[in-house]
Regions:
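Positively charged n-region of N-terminal signal peptides that target proteins for export
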Residues: 1-7
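Bacterial N-terminal signal peptides
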Residues: 7-20
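Electrostatic cytochrome c docking/interface patches
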Residues: 22-37, 50, 67, 77-102, ...
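The canonical Cys-X-X-Cys-His
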Residues: 39-48, 83, 104-114, 148
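N-terminal, post-signal-peptide region of Sec/Tat-exported proteins
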Residues: 49-79
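Short cysteine/histidine-rich zinc-coordinating motifs and their immediately flanking basic loops
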Residues: 54-59, 119-125
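Short microdomains enriched in Cys/His and/or Lys/Arg
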Residues: 62-73, 127-139
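Surface-exposed, polar helix/loop patches in the mature regions of secreted/periplasmic/lumenal proteins
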Residues: 90-118, 125
Length: 159
């Protein structure tokens, strides 16, 4: 193998490994189009938290986006379906049950709901994660801890 070919193989391997690590860590090099639209169109007037705590379905997000456009939000017509799909995927409905409102109002103080959705875990793992959050200052009461734990363990567990 020539020196140039060897260098090329090393560079391709390093790039592939870096891409794999980035994807494995759940980090995109660039936000997706829906997130870009949301940041440009929604968060110019609203704090992201207002979006995070709603957890709406497709019809409700469609109505919300239409209302905001009527009130002056600048969302290009072709971007509306992309924005709605993003909102449903990342800020869509959460399963009903005891603990839902606590998750919506407490966990979203620091986390996007998509973080909860993608972190499927066993009950023990959720307990550890919640304990870590408490140690980092999450405003979760002793009374609410088991309610949230039960909600997460029931609805966001490995398949």
């Amino acid at each position: 193998m020539s020196v140039m070919r060897g260098i090329l193989v090393l560079l391709v391997g390093a790039a592939t490994m870096a891409a794999t690590i980035t994807v494995a860590a759940g980090q995109n090099a660039q936000p997706d189009k829906g997130e870009q639209i949301m940041n440009a169109s929604c968060t110019t007037c609203h704090d992201l938290r207002l979006i995070q705590v709603q957890a709406l379905d497709k019809d409700a997000w469609t109505n919300q986006v239409d209302t905001m456009i009527q009130r002056g939000a600048d969302v290009p017509k072709d971007d509306i379906p992309v924005l709605i799909e993003y909102l449903v995927t990342h800020h869509g409905p959460m399963p009903d049950g005891p603990g839902k409102n606590i998750v919506l109002n407490v966990c979203t103080m620091c986390h996007d709901l998509s973080r909860v959705r993608r972190n499927l875990a066993t009950r023990e793992d959720w307990e550890d994660k919640l304990g870590t959050m408490l140690n980092e200052g999450a405003p979760l009461s002793e009374q609410d801890f088991p309610i949230v734990l039960n909600y997460l363990a029931k609805n966001f567990k490995p398949q």
